[in-house]
């Protein structure tokens, strides 16, 4: 892992501004260019002397900077490019949040139109509004970045950004964002694929989870920490997979008045049009999930499958629950609960679950799982099915109320409490056979979004329902001016 303090900055002789325009798909760049015709203020500076550093250090030999609103320091447009041992600095703002968040306006490093951009041993610093650090936009576009450090300080300025079907592959990065609505690992309209292996990812701003997913995002062997927001947010028909990850979340500030709850992981559908409707997915294998404030999981206005296998889960908030599936301000009132399929494999899990009267839970315990907690201790009437495989167990910590149960004679330990199954008291030591609750993978209603998250959907959808989600392709014509703040 890179130590930020070990990045070397050396004395240098300022070179003349170097401007090169990215041309055909066959052209290849080699890391000494500021490659955007639109980036007229990008400059490159040589580092004339070098200092040998350790294996974890980054040796900087060139600097590229850009201070023009809306422009890039580096742009790869339909070509294969490689850069290494650079420091990239971006200041300036974007006039349009949509242009910046959807299409890469004002990002420090931008790849588009099927480009393949490889970055290694670089430092990226941005200080501007809507100044994302590294952006992959469009089908066929791939950014590969390794052994690098990214810092963003402005609002709405993520570390890694992927939209429009782009691909981002990251290895051993250190990313730190301090602005509001600035996730370390971000996606937006049109989604894409993000693969992260190794590194450290930290966010400090309000509305700045470590991961905000409207894509398929996989992170392995990494440390992730949010000091103000959720650790992970998944919106709509998208996914986050964590393998051997240490995730720490302290959601202690509100980015919206649509929900009163705090949580480590939020899974929802905003109805903004930025994420397709359908089944959201959260998978975590190994590693740890530590929550400092509120609940561990919150699901609202969407259907989701959550799979946890051999994860150490700690909730430091004694008043928080493990899972809350409930209505909030997104979607249509009365039809915007959470619908959850929860799979626990080889888990020791402690924590209560709350499923409100318009929400649904199917919980499956397998592979020697022990769950200690209460489900709907206040009898809030949500539909709940529990299935306990032989060798797994549910230990009650309070009276609990569920709809249906499948277990063998050893699957339930009442522990002095009462379990009601569809209103009938369960007798410990008996078998039970029930049926899962059908979950339909669609969200309900149209709703605005929290400040810093996607806004209202476009008008013109039939019957008051959302239309097809945008593909992420840039619309024709001039870009919109202004635009709402984004996540």
Predicted segments with their positions:
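Disordered, low-complexity segments in secreted/periplasmic proteins that are enriched in proline
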Residues: 27-47, 271-273, 331, 445-487
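Extracellular, surface-exposed repeat architectures
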Residues: 416-438
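Surface-exposed loop/turn motifs in large extracellular/passenger domains
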Residues: 42-61, 75-97, 101, 105-126, ...
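Surface-exposed loop/turn positions within long extracellular repeat scaffolds
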Residues: 377-383, 396-406, 419-421, 426
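Bacterial N-terminal signal peptides that target proteins for export
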Residues: 2-12
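Beta-strand-rich domains and repeat architectures in extracellular enzymes and scaffolds
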Residues: 65-77
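C-terminal motif of bacterial Sec signal peptides marking the signal peptidase cleavage site
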Residues: 20-24
């Amino acid at each position: 892992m890179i130590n930020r303090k070990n990045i070397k900055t050396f004395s240098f002789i300022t070179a003349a501004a170097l401007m090169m325009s990215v041309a055909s798909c066959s052209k290849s760049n080699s890391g000494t260019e500021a490659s955007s015709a639109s980036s007229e203020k990008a400059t490159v500076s040589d580092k004339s002397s070098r200092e040998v550093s350790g294996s974890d250090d980054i040796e900087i030999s060139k600097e590229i900077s850009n201070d023009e609103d809306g422009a890039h320091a580096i742009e790869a447009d339909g070509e294969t490019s490689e850069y290494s041992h650079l420091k990239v600095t971006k200041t300036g703002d974007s006039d349009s949040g949509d242009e910046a968040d959807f299409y890469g306006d004002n990002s420090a490093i931008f790849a588009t139109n099927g480009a393949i951009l490889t970055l290694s041993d670089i430092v990226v610093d941005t200080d501007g509004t809507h100044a994302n650090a590294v952006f992959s936009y469009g089908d066929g576009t791939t950014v590969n970045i390794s052994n690098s450090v990214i810092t963003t300080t402005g609002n709405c300025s993520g570390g890694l950004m992927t939209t429009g079907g782009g691909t981002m592959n990251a290895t051993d990065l250190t990313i730190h964002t301090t602005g509001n609505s600035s996730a370390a690992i971000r996606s937006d309209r049109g989604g894409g694929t993000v693969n992260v292996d190794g590194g450290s990812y930290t966010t400090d701003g309000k509305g700045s989870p470590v991961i905000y997913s409207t894509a398929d995002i996989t992170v392995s062997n990494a440390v992730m920490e949010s000091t103000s927001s959720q650790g992970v947010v998944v919106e709509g028909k998208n996914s986050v997979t964590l393998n051997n990850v240490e995730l720490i979340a302290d959601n202690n500030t509100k980015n919206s008045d649509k929900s009163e709850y705090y949580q480590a992981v939020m899974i929802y559908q905003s109805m903004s049009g930025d994420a397709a409707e359908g089944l959201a997915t959260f998978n975590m294998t190994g590693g740890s999930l530590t929550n400092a404030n509120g609940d561990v999981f919150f699901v609202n206005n969407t259907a989701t499958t959550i799979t946890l296998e051999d994860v150490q889960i700690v909730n430091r908030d004694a008043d928080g629950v493990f899972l809350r599936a409930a209505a909030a301000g997104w979607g249509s009132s009365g039809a915007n609960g959470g619908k959850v399929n929860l799979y626990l494999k080889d888990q020791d899990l402690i924590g209560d679950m709350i499923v409100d009267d318009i929400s649904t839970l199917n919980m499956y315990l397998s592979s020697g799982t022990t769950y200690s907690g209460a489900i709907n201790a206040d009898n809030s009437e949500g539909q709940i099915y529990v299935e306990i495989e032989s060798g797994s167990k549910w230990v009650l910590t309070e009276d609990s109320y569920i709809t249906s149960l499948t277990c063998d004679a050893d699957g339930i330990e009442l522990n002095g409490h009462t379990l009601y199954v569809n209103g009938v008291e369960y007798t410990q030591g008996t078998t039970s056979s029930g049926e899962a609750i059908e979950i339909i993978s669609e969200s309900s209603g149209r709703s605005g979004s929290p400040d810093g998250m996607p806004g209202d959907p476009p008008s013109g959808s039939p019957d008051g329902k959302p239309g097809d989600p945008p593909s992420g392709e840039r619309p024709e014509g001039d870009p919109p001016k202004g635009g709402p703040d984004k996540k």
